[in-house]
Amino acid sequence: LIRSRGLGDVYKRQIITSLRPPAEVVEAAHSYGGLVFHDVINVRHAKKAADMGVDGLILVCAGAGGHAGALSPFALLREVKSWFDGTIILSGSIGDGYSVASALALGADFAYLGTRFIATQEANAEPEYKQMLIESSANDIVYSNLFTGVLGNYLKPSIQNSGLDPDNLPTADKSAMNFGSGGNTDSKAWKDIWGSGQGIGLIEDAPTVEELVDRLKSEFTEASSEFNTKAKIL
């Protein structure tokens, strides 16, 4: 798709950074015209990244899959929007076209979907992982820092399958971050313990990416139309 639309060079220039100060990456990327977008979970992190010259901020809000913050998108996006002039991308529980439309209505430039695309035919994920996403709901998400030292959202059944009690997980030492293992467990984060956002209640199948994108576009159009109708009434 990227090659057919001549977007290869565009996407090569987009760099996403996370979990460490992006200054070095910004300097390197800007030397050849690249753009850097940095993951943040609060205003303090956002201001630090902005001061380092990032081109955009990815607001990883409550309910996002994997490493995620705990702030409402309403609070974080609107506050960041009040002082940041760069690109703002919203992440967290965005699983359909209605969610995308809501993100843009709130003031985001782009909506960031992650978990929903894991449950697609092309995704390089275990079939069991995809099926677990289809069968689970928001009630099956556990927010813990045990597995990497950083708080994140994970699928409860995958934690149970690793022999752990998802309702009684200890708290890890966040100063000992380890993104390649399971932290204080024998299970490995991402390999055995699967990340997921809270929006999985909307996942009912694993279509092709093309089918999913078409569906998102249709839902986005429906949501926009409904919003415009309600706005006229108000």
Question: Whereabouts are the PLM-identified features?
Answer:
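Catalytic beta/alpha-barrel core
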Residues: 12-21, 35-42, 58-60
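Single conserved hydrophobic/aromatic residue that forms the stacking wall/gate
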Residues: 1-11
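Short beta-strand/loop segments at the ligand-binding rim of alpha/beta enzyme cores
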Residues: 27-41, 83-91
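Glycine- and other small-residue-rich loops at beta-strand/loop junctions that grip anionic moieties
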Residues: 15-18, 38-39, 65-69, 89-93, ...
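Hydrophobic residues within beta-strands of alpha/beta enzymes
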Residues: 15, 57-58, 88, 111
